[in-house]
Amino acid sequence: MNRVSVLSKYQCLKINSPNRFFSKYFTTSTINSTKITNDQSQTNSAGKEISQPILKSQDKLKKSILKTSTDTNFLKDINKKHRQHYIKPQKDDENIILKTLNDLKTNNLNTKELISDRLSELFLNKEMIKLISENEIESINEIFKIVLGAKKSQQPPTVAFFTKSFLNKSSKEFKMKLDSLPIIVYFLSVFESKDIMKSSDSDSDSTATNNYLTVGKGISKKFIQNFQDSISSELDITDLQEHLSDMIKLSKFSRLLGYLTNVEISRDKIKKLKDKNEIFNQLINEFGENINEIEFQNLFKNEIHFISFLLTLSRNQIITILSISNNSCYEEEEEVEEVEEVNVKGEGGELFKRVDKYEDNNKGIFNQNKIKSLIENIPVSKVRERLYWFLLMAKLRYPISENYFNDIEISLHYEKDPSFILFFFNHFKIFGYIPSDSSEAKIFQRYVRVATLDEALHYFDSIKKKPQSLNIIMITHLLLAMNKFNNQLDRKIIIDSTTNTTTNTTINTTINNNKIKKYQRSIENEMLTLYSSKIKDIIGSNSSLYNFTLSQLLHGEKWRKVLFNTLVTQLIEKHINSVTDETLLIINEYFSIHKDDVILKKLYELSKKIHLSKELLSNLTIQFLIHKRDYSNAINSLIELYKQETPILKSTLKLLIKSDPTHPILFEFYKTLPQQFELIEPTNQEQEQDQQDQPPPPQQQQEQQQEQQQQQEQQQQQDQQQQDQQQDQQEKQQIKEIKPKLKEKLESEKLINSELFLECINDPMKLYRILDGKIEILASTFQSIVMKSLESGKYQFVESIISKRFGDSSKSIDKHLLSKLITIPNLPISKDDPYNIEKLLLTNNRSENLALYNKLFNLSLNNGLLNCAKNYILKIIQQSNQRLVTSLCYQGEEALIYSYILSLNNLNIINNNQENNNNNNNDLKETIENQIIKWIESVFGCNSLNEINNDDFVFSILLGFHHSTSAYYKKQIGNLNEQQQLPSSLYLKIRSNLMQVINKYFDLIVLDRMILSSYGLESKYYGEAIDFQKDFISMITINELYQYTILKLNLLEKKNNNNNNNNNNNSYYRISIDKKFIENNDQSFNEIDLLLKNISTKQISVIVPFLMGFIENPSLMKYLSVILSNDLNKYDTATTTTTTTTIGNNFIQRLMESSSNSKEIDFLNISNTFFFKYFISVGDLKSAFKVHFKQIHILIRFRLIQDILKNQPLVMDHIFKIISSELELEQQQQQQQQQQQQQQQQQQQQQQQQQQKSSSPSLDYGLIESLLSVTSILNDSKSIHFSLKLYNLASEHAKLNNSRIPLSITNSKDLVLSGFKNRNDHFQLSENLKISDIEKQMKQTRGAGADGADEIIIKNHLTSSQLLNDIKYILIHSNYKQLKGIGFGVLRGDIPFTINDKIKVFLLVEAFAAEEGREKVNSFLNTPSLLNNSLDFELLRTPKITKLISFIFRTNSSIKHDSNYFPEFSPDFLPNKFKFYSAHLEDINNNDNDNSIQDISNIVNCNSGPESFYYRKVLKYFFKKRILKNL
């Protein structure tokens, strides 16, 4: 019985597999180490549901199976009868089956009463299977139970037959569950058992057995397929097969050990196993009781297969097995609770380490010390044993320290089988241990070290196929492996010489030095191609990866330098945006190592192209100049630095000191520094004495000493180093000439480089003492001292020097210092004296105090000092009178209300965190809320809002509030807990107040003006301003707009009449309009008509915002378009007065006149926006873009154009046509300029000016960039094509003007394409075709046609679907003109494609070029159906395309006709080629009568040659015509 209990534990052996799908489902049940008795197994069987893979109730069945499978007698009865023992069902059979099934469902089936053979046979009967399936048994486990119940069915043939028929017939009808897998595996294991083979007595028996074995294997395959279908499509069939066979082998102990270890690894060791089988049988049969102590120890210490067997079990099972041995020399293991399985996937792809700790109470066989001693006792030569123990440790989740990793490294160092290293490495990861980057790299390096070159390259190839797996660690492995390859042959020789002298001599004789060099060269080339092709693509814009790779290439062989150069070039050309300061520092370091001028130049180029930190830029520039010995420029640029920001100079000088501390330029520069202290320059004799009093940095003294030493050395070695000395003298001479200029500049600027001094004299107090009293400390120096002191916490010192500097004297505190102090993140605010800094800073009652209070308020809040915060906010509210806040707004401070609102939200959050002070905080919050509302009301309630400044103020408050609430709500809603509710009450209160204010005072002109100017395009509030404008215009009715407009007109007149009269009574300007009058649409329309008709030119600017209100409100837009429309028919709904027809025309003309004459940018922007929106809404696209074309990018920034482009795709084509027509116009003008004489130039200029006003002829790169940015947001195929067209247009324009396209445009285009690529995976190019290759080839062979593209296509494509995919990609991402030959190349017949595929390719490429086909192809390109055979050719069938294809069929004999696709191309379609030629030419001539037939016939008839030559010429001509027309 003991044997059975042990065996039962292995029925659900956990599959140890990297396949995550498996780990999800194959969870092991917890196993008790207690023995299971008969009673338990019987009593437990009835009531329990079948939920786990192996049930205790089935132990009997398992026992019987195992006994029969190992019992040799049962095979003697095997003969053909077994396969024919099935009988026809009788009438009662159905009832029996149904009853049995019912019992199964209700769990009444008692396994004690073993089911009769008859019942078992019934279940095996083919005709009964259907009946069984109709009864919906949830799992096939129950059926198997019944089948196993009968003795006869336990014999392999019966089981085989049943399994086969059952799986074949019913797997789709039954729901197969994973828990049935172990039972099925049992069946399958019977056929593969060695015992069957051993026990066959006669030949006939063995053949029968073999038949069953083959049946079994067939079943297993069939089963795998069904299993895969029914369980999950995720499963990889090969994986499943592999794991299934593992399970089969696991479940038979007789073959357990041979398969538990990785078969590939240990083939040689399997033979040795037979001798040791006895130990294992003993271990298994008498497990835990009679095992010999020594044998048990030996098992652990020396038997590698036993450990590998343990590795295949679940953690609990391992512990159970190892803890059973009571009599062994090890302590007894207490029962261990199952720890949850650790998620080995890792979230977000990050490297991770074990989180859970395995509690080790120094009990049981497996405490860490014992494992450690075990490992230490294993001889170093037994590498595998040690490594397996490490794996076992990992499996049991012991913490593996760095020391262990070292041990692993050492062990791996001696392991010579690369496949085992891979096995080890992968399993180590599976068990959830990811070593640090360096450890992993080292471990993996061992693999590369023992692998042959081929194996390693094969590994690299596998990486190449999965670019995403090429992470930083893998690159490390590759780079580390490089060195090894270069010396691999030598290593082979060395190793072989140590092992075998004969092989050494043979190798030496066969491989001579030349071959070794050649071999190394090939390796270098291989690595270079691998890196330059793959890694560049993979790295892309990943700057950290780039930097890592570059840093790895700093030292080493020649190919590394080559690669470094190519990567840097690639960086400059393609990924300039991913260049960081770090990148430049690496390149700089490379230069300092190799002194490579080429790199330095590239670095210099690079630094010019990108917006780097000024620091680096200056460092590079100066280094470059010094390297070129251009000292005058170097010093000049140092002076430039000196004028700008101090930190730059500091780092530049530091860098120079680092690279060459004795460089003369440094001394000269340092010597000039003391001059700016306004000290009398000491004479040479005094200089040494006064040195200590002056504050030059300590480095300077060292530098000077070094210089003196250097001069002495030079004198000593004068004879040897004459040239060097001369060079030095020249340099010094140059510097002497520059020195006076340098002094002049520095003295005139009166600068001080305080940062440099602070850097050299670290202690700010010391520096202050050095400077104090001797010279007037400049503000910047003082500021630095204060800031440094505050950082280091010397508050008293700061207090004393500030009070000394500002306290007694009448001087007010320095503004810059104040602004700096306010920005200190942790300005000290103590609970005892919250005003300690305040006392120092608040000298008089100037406006900066408000900002300071604001800062102090926020600080108090962040430090949790709520009472301080309350005091400060009350002070702010008391102090902030309207003028003060207005002036602050003008100073660029954020609207204060913004910070208050955010602060309240913070208070609220603090409120929730500090539950103790809940009531106080609520009170505080309420008082502050009330104060703010009172404050807002008081500010808004004052009667002097007529001044424009105050409109600004109101707007800034509104905008600030809108910004703070919307931004805060957007940001915080996701991040806050439910408890932390936002102060919505305040929001609603203020919002209602705002609406009152808006209704009372709102001014659309102010709004528009503020949006367009003060909060201009660059403002961070810009987006919020637009949203806000939309918000509040949407609340306004047409009546209010009209009323408001009248109000503004009166206001305007009033202002004109009384310029000096400040009338504060707003109601005076309000005109009360009768509601009935407003509600009567006809009448109000008439009023508006009259208003528009009679408005004076001066007043037009007032009207525009009114009209804008219409446009912003879609429901009102229709009224406006009716009023302004010139078309009477559109005006049927309203009253048709005589004035209406002319109003629209007059008004728009007058508005255009006034806007063209106006110098006010604000008005221009508003009116142009209006025109654009108005024309778009009316549908007059041409006018929309002609009105004021240059303004489109403003509209784009307004976010207006996005909606228009989305809803009206035609707009894109219009924009493009306008841009391109203007470009043509510009070209014409250029030609005219060349032809005309100087006398006509003035006229020409006048014309140009006029045209610029109307249509802006020069190409506006900013506009193109803006449009590209819009299309990147839209991200659909139309916008992609549009952006590519724009980009091509810009590049053509750049070529014409011999200029370069701005980098920003290229980046915008790349952004568009990358967004598109991410969205449509099926547009990716297949791996073996790179678009850059094709484009490169096209450039080379552009003159000779498109043969290059054909060759590439032919070389790289074996399947048509892949080619179609690539062509799709090319059409979308490239300029068609470069690739138009692909279609012909495919049709030529050189590619082994079917005719249908050829036609598909041809149609795609050429229809894209033909005008009729292009739109269809565009829509077609967006559907994935391109890859299916169900290509709808009707989409592309146009008259010209049809003729073209028939022409190809007629002229190219290598294309066989397929009438299914194109029935009209049957041989009878055209009698002969000549007719077709003439018809075709006639057709071309009729459509394009600007060319004569003669030209075409010349093309066709030129040269003799193969027929394909002619058709290509004709087609080329045809498509050339098409392309020119379109582009």
Curated annotation (Swiss-Prot):
Residues 700-728 have a biased composition (Low complexity). The keyword Coiled coil applies. The keyword Coiled coil applies. Keywords: Coiled coil. Residues 262-293, 699-751, 905-932, 1217-1255 form a coiled coil. InterPro entries: Mediator/Homeobox_domain. SUPFAM superfamilies: beta-sandwich domain of Sec23/24. It comes from the Eukaryota. Residues 683-734 are annotated as: Disordered. This is Putative uncharacterized protein DDB_G0292556. It comes from Dictyostelium discoideum (Social amoeba). The lineage of its organism: Eukaryota, Amoebozoa, Evosea, Eumycetozoa, Dictyostelia.
